């Protein structure tokens, strides 16, 4: 699986959330919880994945094909999201 992103969006994410897209592959190598993001009509299928990055739970918005995961944003999970993640992976 290859990872890609828009460089301007990556820089914006670093400024806004303090998290770089580089290294997010780590999240997808561990236990994850992924849901379809149906909040808006994005014109493409988008997913929200929760997983561990450097020991903390993060939320990644992304698209996915058979070969590529395109990262849209990464942020630290809220307390509720963190609780939901640990509950889901324990089941």
PLM features: what roles do these ranges have?
Residues 1-91:
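Ribonuclease/tRNase effector modules and their secretory precursors
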């Amino acid at each position: 699986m290859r990872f890609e992103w828009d460089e301007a969006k990556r820089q914006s994410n670093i400024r806004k959330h303090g998290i770089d897209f580089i290294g997010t592959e780590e999240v997808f190598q561990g236990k994850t919880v992924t849901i379809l993001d149906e909040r808006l009509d994005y014109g493409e299928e988008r997913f929200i994945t929760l997983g561990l990055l450097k020991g903390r739970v993060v939320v990644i918005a992304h698209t996915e094909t058979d070969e590529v995961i395109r990262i849209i944003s990464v942020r630290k999970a809220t307390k509720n999201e963190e609780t939901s993640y640990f509950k889901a992976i324990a089941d």
